């Protein structure tokens, strides 16, 4: 709850000071839904904050490098987040968290999107779903700008207001074959996001 409250406060500051608009109501439908895997696309640095701000039982799988950052790393360890650099340990920790009732948030691309709509998926999300026998709830994140994406210069301001819409997609049952499911999951995201990707033309404007 402490992490969720902190993320909500941060988003409130972005709304107030930076004219950002976030439509996150769809995520509220997952509260109380019990343990499951939340698989989302990853266009921006804000994605973890957006999802975890609405889900009190969220445990996120994040890049190992983030644990080395002073403030975020401390918060990640406090929240019990999982590093993605040791596949076997990641799967075992994720399965244990799910069995304890957590909602596991994972970005199957493994890092922020470089080539929209999504980069190739790593097998981690599918492998966890298979080993833990858990359903996978897809979450689709759309921004009005590629701000804080991989291609966006860190100190370049976006056009305001920045808007973000987070919607629930299909919920997949526990997979019988993780390799087949990983391909199916990637194809689903490509189909759903293909017409709703932020234009990189705004980067040079």
Name each region found by the language model.
Residues 1-5, 28-31, 99, 144, ...:
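Membrane-interfacial terminal anchoring regions of lipid-handling membrane enzymes
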Residues 1-6, 16-17, 32-86:
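Catalytic core of membrane glycerolipid acyltransferases/transacylases, capturing the structured
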Residues 71-73, 99-103, 114-184:
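A cross-family acyltransferase "interaction/gating" segment
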Residues 90-94, 177:
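Short acidic active-site motifs
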